[in-house]
Amino acid sequence: MGQALFTPSFNLKTGKGQVLVVPYTATDATHCTLETKAIEDVSAFKAVKDGKLTITIDGNEHKLSGLNFETIKTLADVVKILVAENLDIDIEATSENKIKFTSRRLGANDSTILMEATTGGAGTDLYGANYLDGATATTTNATNATGTTLAELVAKAEDFGYFGGILTTQECENTLVKANATAIQAQDHIYYEVTKSLKNMAVLGEQITQANLNKTRLLAYSEKNEKVAIATYATIASSTNYSGTDTCLTMNLKELTGVDPDKNLNQTYYNSAKTNGCDIYGSTCGLSAVYSFGANSYTDEVTADLALKKSLEVAMFNVLKQTMTKIPQTESGVTALKNAAIQVLQQFVRNGAIGTGLKWGSPIPFGNGETFQDNIEKLGYYVYSEPIANQAQSEREARVCPLIQIALKRSGSIHSSDVIVYINR
């Protein structure tokens, strides 16, 4: 996972970032597994061309039918036919000649597997003793993560200095991920997490999106080494050098260097990712790419917003700190602070986060309407404060600057295009 942070050519070092490693004591959540008895002879399977199986995975019942094993030669071939059903579960043949089913979800409440006899209908039930022998299968229940939580760790790590992105090697169940996301949302951090279950996009992804927890970026990736996938995703997302020109990027269609595309994706999962605000990593015509969706905001928007906030904080603090005398509580003093903000905004126009030539698409929230629209279109931003002469006496006594309000227009990013061609003979 650590090596993945530096594998892509564009990584956190490109964005002038560093890695802070903070150890903590915790256990991983585990997956539920179901393992058959040893199957030494697959000849019984070879006679099956109409196999059926009822299996409930993470609370979702699946009734498989029409399974044809006539061409199989090994136990691995049996597994291939089961895998081809594209269930949201990992299936493998073990070294002990057993078939092992592993839920892709985590934790006692979310990760479950139940195999049972199929009632009614034609076909050969693979639950039977001559096949999977479901009655003797061994189930190992999933467990929840324990120990220090990510929220507790972040509070401790902040003593070392500021950090933006957060990754954890800990495997977390949905409830813990949601708790982490809720805690991080109130802070100046971005939490990168991955779910191995594609169906979990409609559960965990929906929960995070509906709660407006957009500082949590959820990648759904069902292949092996999912933690490597999210680390690679996170380092590319953190690679923007906001001091440059045209350096802002979108995660859409980016290649995750060293990560295989998810072969289990289909149109249903694509639609689920789009609806539930998750990103996925697939392949189109042999090209591996991230497919990024905005139901929970786009990742580049969240990273740029945080970079802008921290840049404004530093710039305006520096005005106060680097002034040898004082900033007067007059219009000229307010202008000095506004000019510092404007310099930051101009840089974010240059780096591509803020766009010009665009119109404000909602009711004007403050200031002079005509000036507001003109500034947004020409500059990409509008900076406003009420005249200091109108400031309340209590604020003057507290030596507070009048509220400085900033509106800006995102530059956005084109992710797709429609083309109509008119042909005349």
Can you say where each PLM-predicted feature lies in the sequence?
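Structured, hydrophobic secondary-structure cores that serve as assembly/anchoring elements
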Residues: 1, 291-425
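Acidic/histidine-rich, surface-exposed loop or edge segments in extracytoplasmic proteins
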Residues: 55-66, 317-322
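Extended basic-aromatic, gly/pro-enriched interface segments that bind polyanionic ligands
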Residues: 210-339
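Helix N-terminus capping/helix-initiation residues
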Residues: 131, 148-149, 261-266, 330, ...
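Polar low-complexity, Ser/Thr/Gly/Ala/Asp/Asn-rich disordered segments used for subunit assembly
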Residues: 1-58, 67-227, 363-365, 375-381
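Generic serine detector
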Residues: 7-9, 25, 43, 65, ...
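Short, surface-exposed charged micro-motifs
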Residues: 88-90, 277, 405
